[in-house]
């Protein structure tokens, strides 16, 4: 589903994070690994504090091996991101995605994990391909 440009972007986030792990607001990662072979990554999520905000974070990437879709790994990753952010006192998580038909399962996933579609920017990526914004409110105690 991801283009080579998208894969390159995701890899650059990893490189940036590990090149300077002491940066003040680093990209953060949650990884799902195989229980028998921890080197085998099943999926991951990348998230971080939205610059110039107080308590808002962005989910940059959440990806699961396509052969494992529907097995609950994405939900576990998403729930762990939400747990970490709540523990940090954050109040909302913002997600951006495409309106293309091949992203329909992704948009349905965000709805299933409690996100709400907040906005659309028409023709953002290209004509007929909107940028869709979802928000997950994070209840903190």
Language-model features: where?
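Acetyl-CoA-dependent GNAT
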Residues: 1-67, 75-80, 84, 88, ...
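Conserved G/P- and acidic residue-centered "switch" motifs that form tight phosphate/ATP-binding loops
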Residues: 72
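Active-site-proximal loop/turn and secondary-structure-junction residues that shape catalytic pockets
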Residues: 63, 99-101
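Conserved catalytic-core motifs of GNAT/GCN5-like acyltransferases
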Residues: 96-99, 111, 115-132
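Conserved GNAT acetyl-CoA-binding A-motif
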Residues: 85-99
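Helix-turn-helix
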Residues: 106
């Amino acid at each position: 589903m991801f283009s080579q440009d998208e894969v390159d972007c995701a890899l650059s986030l990893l490189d940036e994070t590990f090149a300077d792990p002491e940066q003040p607001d680093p990209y953060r990662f949650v990884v799902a690994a195989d229980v028998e072979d921890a080197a085998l990554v099943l999926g991951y999520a990348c998230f971080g504090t939205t610059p110039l905000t107080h308590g808002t974070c962005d989910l940059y990437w959440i990806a699961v091996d396509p052969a494992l879709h529907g097995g609950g790994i994405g939900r576990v990753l998403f729930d762990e991101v939400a747990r970490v952010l709540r523990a940090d006192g954050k109040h909302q998580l913002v997600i951006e995605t495409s309106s293309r038909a091949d992203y329909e399962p992704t948009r349905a996933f965000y709805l299933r994990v409690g996100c709400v579609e907040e906005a659309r920017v028409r023709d953002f990526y290209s004509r007929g391909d909107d940028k869709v914004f979802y928000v997950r409110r994070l209840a903190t105690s």
